[in-house]
Amino acid sequence: LLYVSGMAVSDTPAEVFKRALAHAARALAEQPDLEVAFASDGPKLSGHQLTLPTPPRDPSGPEAQALRGQADRMALRLANHDEGLNARLRPADASAAEVFDAVEQTRIEAVGSASLTGVRDNMNAALVSRLHRMGAAAATEAQRVPVAEAVGLLVRERLTGEPAPDGLKAMVDLVREDLEDRAGDQLDALTALASDQGAFGAALKDVLRALDLDPGDGRGEDASDDPGEEEPDPQEPD
């Protein structure tokens, strides 16, 4: 495990690349004291430490851009995400939580990289690399497409105005019509809320409901904010 700090380190291409990654991560996270480490179990966030995978031998190749994207997306999470609020909003149901997590990460990245083309390119490379490793990018049947990833890509299109990255369009198109038919209106409603994590997360529960997933708020699929005529009056506190 190698920590990158203010100490002098060798100027090999790998070390220069690590220092550049650490500097960029601190800037995006808006945390100048963020600890950045490199280890085989990265990427992960733990408290005030960001652990990234060990860089490839060639710091100029596609693997290096994907690693920059991993660093960027996690740094933006530190700057644009409230973990406490997320814990209160996140569904307990595993399938619903997967979709919730994917869409919240999409929000984080869209908000954080709105004017940063290079950061968006890096995160696109990381996304394509991850879905290729999962085997999802090569899917030829709708049932092989991870719902969470597909919903995240549909939200990404709405928040950024950009199509799915090259290599992922065919995957998302396999399920696009079905997901749009079921939850298109609810997905559209997310667009205006991207800068407000709480409002976005609350609206995201409507997306989950439209997809027949349990949002964890005790409301049924057809629930509305209007209590209706048969709703009992609230009891006075003791």
Which residue ranges define each predicted feature?
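Acidic, serine/threonine-rich intrinsically disordered low-complexity regions
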Residues: G218-D238
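Basic/hydrophobic alpha-helical interface regions
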Residues: L2-L193, F200
